[in-house]
Curated annotation (Swiss-Prot):
Gene: atpA
Protein's recorded name: ATP synthase subunit alpha
Pfam family, any one: ATP-synt_ab_N
UniProt KW ATP-binding keyword: yes
Main location: membrane
Disulfide bridges in this chain: none
Length: 527
């Protein structure tokens, strides 16, 4: 029997068997939960964990590493605290916290991790991994802001113009119309969407009531704005960590559109609540506190978020080398895109010199300050022209608007000053009386109902009437009636020779003559 066994055959069989053995072993680095409290877990055993790394528990709840200490890791939970217990096993994912972004997200309501909240099923289509935290583009990858982002609000587009790639703060007390300005701006982008040059909008709701978010989504849907809008919601009932990361998720979605050569607008409503959420998380993690109990890096929190808004350079070779570009976008980067940010800050009793407001004012490229007194007087949007500013200015206006509204801001500030003095004196010289009358009528012209943004060409035409004194014979109480009749008359008789020309940014003698004749004709009925 032994003669029939050949050593060479046995060795061949053994070699084949050994070659076929699967030696792949999956190594998971795991840790144990030492302590759970108020949305924060301390974990032992994750020696190689990285800052901002995503961790996962056996029950599917995720956490993000925030503190790296000698003998343990501090992480913030992105789910309910009561579902995590001491002794639970947690494993590293070896991935930095990120969100998957794609065109199929448009029209959806999601949480900061990209999970749908609107009950319409999973988000399909091609999705790209975008990190929540990412370095802002360096100076050489940017270009100056020179393209307008029309809000549809006369007061903003004329006096505090916003450009694509700018960061403009909306600041004011509660119930002064801050969210309304942002929502009107989103609704106004519908014209661009229909014209084939969309500005994709991301509305980030931080720490708001669920019913408020639902109401905003319904409004956007009613005006056809959800076709180009994504809503990221971390409501008041969500963990503080989700409220903290929500703006970063919004920025990551906006960067996807920006880096693929398109225009995006992100609204952070509001960053005061994000700062409070970050303070809560930091105090539970026992980080040292500073002024008003906020952690020392609260300024850095907002600066690194808002610096991500930018207008990208138009040179392809340079843009492709952009710093900190995600792997998923390499190969599909396009030039000339922009990300505009409209952060919102809530003040207490109009105090703009508080800690968080001054921080964000110093980071942004201007602010729109809303006042309770003006709001209660019926001036809406309730913008205080004196302390509102856009540091981009006329660069972000089309030529016709720049020419017509150039002196409007100064005129209105002068009118407010003279009006304050006129209360102490009954007799006024004719020039002062005329300035006050013109200022009052212009203030009436700038009042605008909610959810009714106006195309830029109509804004220019009606503001021309105000700045050139064509409302002299129109009584103050009839100014808004005059505006309606004037716009209707232009649409009926001068659509091509006036409104279509103004839309291109041109204002010449023929246009001004037609505007003056139409204004005189409409004003006659008030004599």
């Amino acid at each position: 029997m032994s003669e029939n066994i050949r050593v060479s055959e046995v060795s061949d069989i053994l070699r084949k068997q050994l070659e076929g053995i699967n030696t792949n072993v999956q190594l998971d680095e795991i840790g144990t939960v030492l302590q759970v409290s108020d949305g924060v877990v301390r974990i032992y055993g994750l020696r190689n964990a990285e800052a901002n790394e995503l961790l996962e528990f056996d029950n599917g709840i995720k956490a993000i590493v925030m503190n790296l200490e000698e003998d343990n890791v501090g992480a913030v939970l992105l789910g309910p605290t009561d579902r995590i217990k001491e002794g639970f096993i947690v494993k590293r994912t070896k991935r930095i916290a990120s969100i998957r972004v794609g065109e199929s997200m448009l029209g959806r309501v999601i949480d900061p991790l990209g999970e749908p909240l609107d009950g319409k099923g999973l988000i399909g289509g091609e999705l790209y991994e975008m990190p929540l935290e990412r370095k802002a583009p360096g100076v050489i990858y940017r270009q100056p802001v020179n393209q307008p982002l029309q809000t549809g609000l006369k007061a903003v587009d004329a006096m505090i113009p916003i450009g694509r790639g700018q960061r403009e703060l909306i600041i004011g007390d509660r119930q002064t119309g801050k969210t309304s300005i942002a929502i009107d701006t989103i609704i106004n982008q519908r014209n661009n969407f229909l014209a084939g040059d969309p500005v994709y909008c991301i509305y980030v709701a931080i720490g708001q009531k669920g019913s408020t978010v639902a109401s905003i989504v319904n409004t956007l849907r009613e005006y056809g704005a959800m076709d180009y809008t994504i809503v990221v919601a971390a409501t008041a009932g969500d963990p503080a960590a989700l409220q903290y990361y929500a703006p970063f998720a919004g920025a990551a979605i906006g960067e996807y559109f920006r880096d693929t050569g398109r225009h995006a607008l992100v609204v952070y409503d509001d960053l005061s609540k994000q700062a409070v959420a970050y303070r809560e998380v930091s105090l539970i993690l026992r980080r040292p506190s500073g002024r008003e109990a906020y952690p020392g890096d609260i300024f850095y929190l907002h600066s690194r978020l808002l610096e991500r808004a930018a207008k990208i350079i138009k040179e392809e070779e340079v843009a492709r080398e952009m710093n900190d570009l995600p792997e998923s976008l390499k190969g599909i980067v396009k030039v000339g895109g922009s990300l505009t940010a409209l952060p919102i800050i809530e003040t207490q009793a109009g105090d703009v010199s508080a800690y968080i407001p001054t921080n964000v004012i110093s980071i942004t490229d201007g602010q729109i300050f809303l006042e309770t007194d003006l709001f209660n007087q019926g001036v809406r949007p309730a913008i205080n022209v004196g302390i509102s500013v856009s540091r981009v200015g006329g660069n972000a206006q089309i030529k016709a608007m720049k020419k017509v509204a150039g002196t409007l801001k100064m005129d209105q500030a002068q009118y407010r000053e003279l009006e304050a003095f006129s209360k102490f004196s009954s007799d006024m010289d004719p020039i002062t009386a005329m300035t006050i009358d013109k200022g009052r009528k212009n203030a009436q012209l700038l009042i605008q109902p909610q959810y009714s943004p106006m195309p830029v060409e109509q804004q220019i035409a009606i503001l021309y009437c105000g700045t050139h004194g064509l409302l002299h014979d129109v009584p103050l109480e009839n100014v808004q009636d005059f505006e309606r009749s004037f716009i209707e008359s232009l649409q009926l008789n001068h659509q091509e020779d006036v409104l279509d020309v103004l839309r291109t940014g041109v204002i010449d003698d023929n246009v001004t003559k037609a505007i003056e004749e139409t204004a005189a004709m409409v004003a006659k009925q008030y004599l």
